[in-house]
A protein has these predicted regions:
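A short acidic/basic microdomain associated with nuclease active sites
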Residues: 84-114
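Charge-dense, intrinsically disordered terminal/linker segments
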Residues: 60-68, 77-80, 94, 98, ...
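Short, well-structured alpha-helical interface segments that form or flank functional binding sites
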Residues: 70-81, 103-107, 126
Length: 310
């Protein structure tokens, strides 16, 4: 397999990437417990999953669960093989890898500047391929298309989710499947660019923005109080204590609306600024911050599907 990849002319671009170091190793051990008689018992049907970076037990699984070819370094190699097999130009590609402190989740993001959309006045968005994997059952191995707006480094959320690949078991991707899915992903990315351009020309009222942020933040009080003014709503405890909603509203009124205008593109960028940059809640476990980001992206997807023009 390595010899095949070395023959790929795009390999030279991946060779320029900084290596990902310090990856944990996943291991397992038998489940043991003390019964009512004080005896130490081994459960023959279960085992616990741990990593070399933490003493945490990150999952309890059936005995036949395997992480053969599913170690974090395997996922990195698979991510490289996948984008090589996809047939796209990888010149200038960058990579970002994030792993939760206890090793239970990992995320790899490739940004591919050879596929860039300019939606006007130099406002550029670059194509991304995202790889997700977890060992605590949060999500299965997933490959998804994404994008990043270069002006603010917001991770763009596609209105139509494009999961290129999912697997609950040992990950592997057929080269033909990778190429086919990449063609679909780039077409979707280009279609999203056309949608974003339309949003720049689609004017929006403050109330439309307010309701869209409430949808993403799960602020039901706003959505059920159409007769109340924005001013009155902002005085209500159910609104001003919703940190996600207030983050988006403040981002919109103090930045996006000021620089982009009162339009759906500005609303969208306030949404993606929240999903990309907003801090996790005070009670959020540090090992669940990656989960929070993905959950926010799904909330944004739902809001734009119901509140912004197609």
């Amino acid at each position: 397999m390595n010899n095949i990849l070395q023959l790929n002319p795009q390999q030279k671009h991946l060779d320029l990437l900084e290596p990902i170091t310090g990856l944990p190793t996943i291991s397992s051990s038998p489940v043991k417990f003390v019964n009512n008689f004080g005896q130490l018992i081994t459960d023959p049907k279960r085992k616990v999953i741990t990593t070399t970076t933490s003493d945490d037990i990150i999952n309890v699984v059936k005995k036949d669960f395997t992480f053969e070819n599913n170690q974090p370094d395997d996922i990195v190699r698979l991510s490289e093989a996948t984008i090589l097999q996809s047939g796209i130009n990888l010149k200038g590609t960058t990579r970002h890898c994030q792993i939760s402190p206890n090793g239970s989740k990992m995320f790899i993001q490739y940004t591919i500047p050879e596929h860039t959309i300019d939606i006007g006045n130099g406002d550029e968005t670059q194509f991304q391929i995202l790889f997700y994997n977890s060992y605590d059952g949060t999500w299965c191995f997933t490959v998804r298309a994404g994008a990043i707006r270069m002006a603010c480094l917001n991770g763009q959320v596609h209105a139509d989710d494009l999961s290129m690949f999912k697997s609950k078991h040992t990950p592997s991707i057929n080269p033909d499947h990778a190429r086919r899915k990449m063609v679909e992903a780039i077409k979707t990315f280009e279609a999203e660019g056309e949608r974003w351009s339309r949003w720049k020309d689609q004017s929006a009222t403050n109330r439309q923005a307010f309701d869209c942020f409430a949808e993403a933040a799960g602020c039901k009080f706003v959505l059920s109080s159409e007769d109340m003014s924005i001013y009155d709503l902002l005085q209500h405890k159910n609104v001003y204590t919703n940190r996600s909603f207030m983050y988006m509203w403040n981002q919109y009124t103090t930045h996006e609306q000021k620089y982009l205008g009162s339009n759906e593109w500005a609303i969208y960028n306030a949404l993606t600024h929240w999903s990309t940059h907003a801090p996790a809640g005070r009670k959020t476990n540090v090992n669940n911050e990656l989960t929070t980001t993905v959950r926010r992206q799904e909330s944004v997807r739902g809001a734009i599907a119901t509140r912004l023009a197609a």
